[in-house]
């Protein structure tokens, strides 16, 4: 029987683990610190449109606490900046009746950005990933909020760098039984690139959560990014144009909107975590721009701004409006579309 080991118990990993557990699928959640202690002692407080509940999902704090089996699937749901540490911890763990995790077990990345699957492939022989569309929040230890309805979220799931793992259909069936929409794709990098374009808005959501002009900045950031992705030979897939998945049928429960913490970057600032994914979102565009000779002044500047506020513990919206004024002025001067 397949057991899913969810590494990372934040806004993605915890809801996935809860849904799998409630659908009678074998799952273990890997959490840390106060979050792990709260889940172990009281269960995961899981807020859904039909109410809050305590989910007694099994939890461990490290690879050393778990005896890996040949039927395990490692599912990584940490922020990208934690990926290297995760791979170091788990790749060469022994697997009962086999050799090591990297040689034996499949790994699925449920993470943002373009770097995670590539990094995993350095150690793991079988790497898959998903472009994840799942509004959810982790703002306090032991609690996550998942307001999506009727399904919890949507996955575009495939093998990296292309094709499908022999077990992909079985994984998809387990996720569907757990109330997720799953679309199998054999061109995963296109879907990850499409999600990256959407995630470029995370920085503005964190810095300027209450300013309607942030939408104008996001258009300019994406216009800059599209030039970079084209130069890098990437053709982003737009999930809104997917004939097999109708995102218009997906909504957020009004009763949970006041508990939804916004983008993952805004949630990181709210928790004063000290770092964010911006280096692997806007920073990925900056990296590709430098590799392919495409200037990225807007993404570079907002990447640095997010890093500064995260370092200094500034909460969402704490930078004021002058920075947004400057960024919009820069966008206008370079001719980027903002409206």
Sequence positions of predicted segments:
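Rossmann-fold dinucleotide-binding core
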Residues: 112-201
């Amino acid at each position: 029987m397949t057991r899913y080991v969810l590494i990372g118990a934040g806004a993605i990993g915890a809801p996935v683990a809860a849904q799998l557990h409630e659908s009678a699928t074998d799952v273990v959640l890997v959490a840390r610190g106060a979050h792990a202690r709260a889940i172990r002692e009281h269960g995961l407080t899981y807020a859904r449109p039909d109410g809050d509940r305590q989910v007694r999902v099994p939890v461990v704090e490290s690879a050393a606490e778990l005896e890996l089996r040949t039927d395990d699937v490692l599912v990584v749901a940490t922020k990208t900046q934690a990926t290297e540490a995760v791979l170091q911890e788990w790749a060469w763990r022994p697997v009962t009746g086999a050799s090591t995790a990297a040689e034996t077990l499949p790994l699925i990345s449920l993470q943002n950005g373009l770097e995670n699957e590539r990094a995993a492939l350095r150690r793991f022989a079988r790497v898959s990933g998903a472009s994840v569309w799942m509004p959810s929040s982790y703002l306090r230890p032991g609690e996550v909020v998942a307001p999506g309805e009727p399904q919890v979220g949507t996955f575009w799931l495939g093998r990296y760098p292309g094709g499908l793992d022999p077990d992909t259909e079985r994984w998809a069936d387990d996720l569907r039984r757990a109330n997720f929409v799953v679309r199998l794709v054999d061109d995963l990098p296109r879907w990850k690139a499409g999600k990256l374009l959407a995630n470029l808005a995370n920085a503005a959501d964190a810095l300027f959560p209450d300013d309607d002009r942030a939408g104008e900045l996001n258009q300019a950031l994406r216009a800059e990014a599209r030039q970079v992705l084209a130069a890098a030979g990437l053709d982003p897939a737009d999930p809104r144009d997917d004939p097999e998945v109708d995102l218009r049928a997906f909504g957020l429960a009004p009763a949970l909107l006041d508990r939804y913490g916004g983008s993952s970057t805004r949630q990181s600032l709210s928790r004063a975590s000290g770092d964010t994914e911006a280096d692997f979102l806007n920073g990925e565009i900056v990296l590709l721009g430098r590799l392919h000779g495409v200037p990225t002044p807007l993404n570079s500047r907002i990447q640095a701004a997010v890093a500064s506020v995260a370092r200094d513990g500034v909460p969402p919206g704490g930078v004021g409006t002058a920075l947004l004024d400057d960024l919009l002025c820069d966008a206008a001067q370079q001719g980027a579309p903002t409206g």
